[in-house]
């Protein structure tokens, strides 16, 4: 599959249509799926789209070769995204074919809530031509299940509770974490920048 246009517009549309704080659409991948996913990332880093697409299809994902015609010269991106009917909301992972900053990876684990951080990550990715950008697949509170993270938060309820499995910053058995580990191992001197937001209290300056 191939697309042309503006990568920022394309990814912002994915963010806008991602599931919100309710619905329980996020399901955790199993070990076999995590291993298959790791192979997909290997193929993408090697620019082997045919093998990446074959393996991605088995997980109800697809690889879109996206040509951004708003950049001069035009830039090609590999977009690993869920198929439209896929039940697997594991996130969207975009790789630059010819990055300017080969070791820079930008991440947005809370595309819906920390407000605007998903779209800010996309903007930074496009304008730096970083190696990759990771976008979570749902609102951080989408799942009803809790992760094994030792911390607690009140972000999903009025009282403090454990983090949800749909919170990519607080769950290590995810495609988000697996992709992070892969790129950390395979890209020399890799730098990961993860965008977060914080609430402002009336007492804050």
Where are the predicted features?
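N-terminal catalytic or cofactor-binding beta/alpha core of small enzyme domains
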Residues: 1-205
């Amino acid at each position: 599959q191939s697309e042309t246009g503006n990568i920022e517009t394309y990814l912002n549309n994915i963010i806008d249509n991602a599931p919100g704080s309710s619905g329980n659409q996020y399901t955790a991948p199993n070990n076999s799926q995590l291993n298959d996913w790791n192979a997909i990332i290997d193929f993408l880093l090697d620019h082997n789209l045919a093998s990446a697409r074959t393996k991605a299809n088995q997980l109800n994902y697809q690889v879109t070769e996206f040509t951004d015609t708003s950049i001069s010269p035009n830039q090609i991106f590999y977009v690993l995204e869920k198929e439209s009917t896929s039940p697997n909301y594991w996130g969207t992972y975009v790789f630059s074919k010819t990055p300017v900053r080969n070791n820079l990876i930008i991440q947005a684990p809370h595309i819906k809530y920390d407000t605007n951080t998903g779209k800010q990550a996309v903007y930074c990715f496009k304008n730096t031509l970083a190696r990759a950008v990771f976008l979570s697949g749902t609102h951080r509170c989408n799942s009803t299940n809790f992760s094994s993270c030792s911390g607690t938060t009140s972000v999903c309820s009025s009282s403090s509770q454990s983090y949800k499995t749909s919170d990519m910053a607080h769950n290590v058995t995810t495609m988000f974490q697996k992709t992070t580990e892969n790129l950390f191992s395979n890209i020399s001197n890799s730098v990961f920048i993860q965008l977060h937001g914080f609430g402002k209290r009336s007492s804050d300056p």
